[in-house]
């Protein structure tokens, strides 16, 4: 594995965790959004990551990974929370759930745990990047000496 490949792997990890943090921030910001442009309550969003392999490596049968990439962003299909608030403009007007409001399926505690996890993963990628940078600088010093 080349030194530049190490930089590429760390950079892809940093970009992935940044996207994950952006999605978590969106989820927290919309935790009380009862009506979106599509008409229903906000649904929690999650990123699905996969290992990145270059096409050339796959053709050669090599197993070397080259980082991580976002395969897709999915919506959490868990049910919405029902909160009784008959005066809310989005309250269900009739039926057995009359007066209830469908609230987003965002759990703030779960989002905060995910945020801490994403922060730690980001820090780990920064540490790996700094270690690779330090090795490159040492190699240059040895080459000069």
Q: Where are the language model's segments positioned?
A:
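Amphipathic alpha-helical polymerization modules
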Residues: 1-145
């Amino acid at each position: 594995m080349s030194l530049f490949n190490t930089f590429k792997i760390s950079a892809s990890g940093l970009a992935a965790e940044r996207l994950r943090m952006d999605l978590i921030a969106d989820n927290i910001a919309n935790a009380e959004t009862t009506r979106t442009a599509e008409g229903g309550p906000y649904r929690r969003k999650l990123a699905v990551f996969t290992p990145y392999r270059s096409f050339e490596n796959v053709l050669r049968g090599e197993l070397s990974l080259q980082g991580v990439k976002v395969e897709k962003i999915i919506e959490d299909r868990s049910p919405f929370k029902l909160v009784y608030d008959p005066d809310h403009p989005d309250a269900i007007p009739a039926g057995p759930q009359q007066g209830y409001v469908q609230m987003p399926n965002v759990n703030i505690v779960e989002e905060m745990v995910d945020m801490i996890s994403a922060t730690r993963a980001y820090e780990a990628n920064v540490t790996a990047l700094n270690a690779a940078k330090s090795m490159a600088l040492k190699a240059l010093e040895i080459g000069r000496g």
